[in-house]
Amino acid sequence: MTVDAVRVELGARAYEVRIGPGLIARAGAEIAPLLRRPKVAILTDETVAGLHLDPFRQALVEAGIASSALALPAGEATKGWPQFARAVEWLLEEKVERRDVVVALGGGVIGDLAGFAAAVLRRGVRFVQVPTTLLAQVDSSVGGKTGINTAQGKNLVGAFHQPSLVLADIGVLETLPPRDFRAGYGEVVKYGLLGDADFYEWLEGAGPRLAADAEARQRAVRRSVEMKAEIVARDETEEGDRALLNLGHTFCHALEKATGYSDRLLHGEGVAIGCALAFELSQRLGLCAQEAPSRLRAHLRAMGMKVDLRDIPGDLPSAEALLALMAQDKKVVDGKLRFILARGIGQAFVADDVPGDVVRALLEDALAER
């Protein structure tokens, strides 16, 4: 299999997302052209470090590149002020300069945190994303959104800071626990739902074999990245089209906050549930036929994924409380909730005028089924 390259066209800040097998084994050769001096600082997590840090550093050694590494605790709870401050202080202790490169080796949590640390360190240093989860490869590593969570909600503090390079080694996805792989698939299916009905139809057939079929996996990652790159090139800072990428996320972020950013609900699981709710909301508003949410739920079930609120273990707050959590979402405009709705599969659009009582009724019905 060959390596695919998808270019994110952002003028002087354009970069490539390279997708294929064996990219960690030759990471040194891939990163070397970016370096002013042969040294990088790696931010990772303890789980990823145990699997991939040594091979990654060996690849750097083979290219004559020295490295230092900090492994943070794994999990969404790391994506907050304490570990962010720890990472920034460590980078300063390592004397990382403005012309140096920080490497984010890990999933979405590490990519977001490391990217934000790079954005604020000395008012901005370059960084390279080496995403090791399906979710990070198809979504969070591309497009320059970085940040952390706060007590008030998810991703409320951050910056747009584009990477200089993304290396998506599809081989490392074979080390993912099945639950994490399925969670990442929530972001893959999102792309078909928001703007490519043919891709969604292909996923309905190919989805169940992605974990075991490297060629299908690479195709899924490549098409997802192509779609994201096209949208980011049109709307880097989410003034318009880029909001489409938040399909399912208004519900998702409220549910993540309600479950304490814990293992009760992984981000990609929340995205899948959020997409199902967004399509159900669209149907209730008369925007799409009942076939669309039914078809989506059937596919997610076939993939063994969480689909409804009843699939989330433990207690959940009331519909009113979930609405209050949504009101803190960063997509709120003039105090009004912004949803990504759909006229059908592959036909998403941004809606700023969704009646709150319809959303409340949807949540009440979903909670009643638990």
UniProtKB/Swiss-Prot annotation:
Pathway: Metabolic intermediate biosynthesis; chorismate biosynthesis; chorismate from D-erythrose 4-phosphate and phosphoenolpyruvate: step 2/7
Binding site for NAD(+): 108-112, 132-133, 145, 154
InterPro entries reported for this sequence: Dehydroquinate_synthase, DHQ_synth_AroB, DHQ_synth_fam, DHQS/DOIS_N, DHQS_C
Catalytic reaction annotation: 7-phospho-2-dehydro-3-deoxy-D-arabino-heptonate = 3-dehydroquinate + phosphate
SS bond partners: none
GO terms, biological process: amino acid biosynthetic process; aromatic amino acid family biosynthetic process; chorismate biosynthetic process
Main enzyme class: lyase
Molecular function via GO: 3-dehydroquinate synthase activity; metal ion binding; nucleotide binding
Binding-site list for Zn(2+): 187, 249, 267
Top-rank taxon: Bacteria
Cofactor(s) this protein cannot do without: Co(2+); Zn(2+); NAD(+)
Subcellular location as annotated: Cytoplasm
A single cellular component GO annotation: cytoplasm
Matches recorded under Gene3D superfamilies: 3.40.50.1970, Dehydroquinate synthase-like - alpha domain
Alphabetical UniProt keywords: Amino-acid biosynthesis, Aromatic amino acid biosynthesis, Cobalt, Cytoplasm, Lyase, Metal-binding, NAD, Nucleotide-binding, Zinc
Cofactor, free-text remark: Binds 1 divalent metal cation per subunit. Can use either Co(2+) or Zn(2+).
Enzyme Commission identifier(s): 4.2.3.4
Record family assignment: Belongs to the sugar phosphate cyclases superfamily. Dehydroquinate synthase family.
Function, as annotated: Catalyzes the conversion of 3-deoxy-D-arabino-heptulosonate 7-phosphate (DAHP) to dehydroquinate (DHQ).
Name the UniProt record assigns to this protein: 3-dehydroquinate synthase
Taxonomic lineage from the root: Bacteria, Pseudomonadati, Pseudomonadota, Alphaproteobacteria, Rhodobacterales
